[in-house]
Swiss-Prot record:
It comes from Buchnera aphidicola subsp. Acyrthosiphon pisum (strain APS). This is Small ribosomal subunit protein bS16. Belongs to the bacterial ribosomal protein bS16 family. GO terms for molecular function: structural constituent of ribosome. The keyword Protease does not apply. GO terms for cellular component: cytoplasm; small ribosomal subunit. Keywords: Ribonucleoprotein, Ribosomal protein. PANTHER family: 30S RIBOSOMAL PROTEIN S16 (PTHR12919), SMALL RIBOSOMAL SUBUNIT PROTEIN BS16M (PTHR12919:SF20). Gene3D superfamilies: 3.30.1320.10. GO terms for biological process: translation. InterPro entries: Ribosomal_bS16, Ribosomal_bS16_dom_sf. Signal peptide: none annotated. The gene is rpsP. SUPFAM superfamilies: Ribosomal protein S16.
């Protein structure tokens, strides 16, 4: 099954997440099909906290991709 989910990057205690489309059998930070945006929960100054490609997200959901709960909340927040 294809899922839209967050992959964790960054360093210890300074997380940075990429929103990716990946097969559910792959590990969290493993192979992915496409990168759809990012989420930086500790952004400072003029840095963007959330950037999403809503057009591609719509494309993947129409193709049958399932979203994680956190991803659903972030997309709802962006719209």
């Amino acid at each position: 099954m294809v899922k839209i989910r967050l992959a964790r990057y960054g360093t210890k205690k300074r997380p940075f997440y990429k929103l990716v489309v990946a097969d559910s059998r792959f590990s969290r930070n493993g192979r992915f099909i496409e990168r759809l945006g990012y989420f930086n929960p500790i952004a400072k100054g003029k840095s963007e906290i959330l950037k999403l490609n809503l057009e591609r997200i719509e494309h993947w959901t129409n193709q049958g991709a399932q979203m994680s709960e956190r991803t659903k909340k972030l997309i709802k927040q962006k719209r």
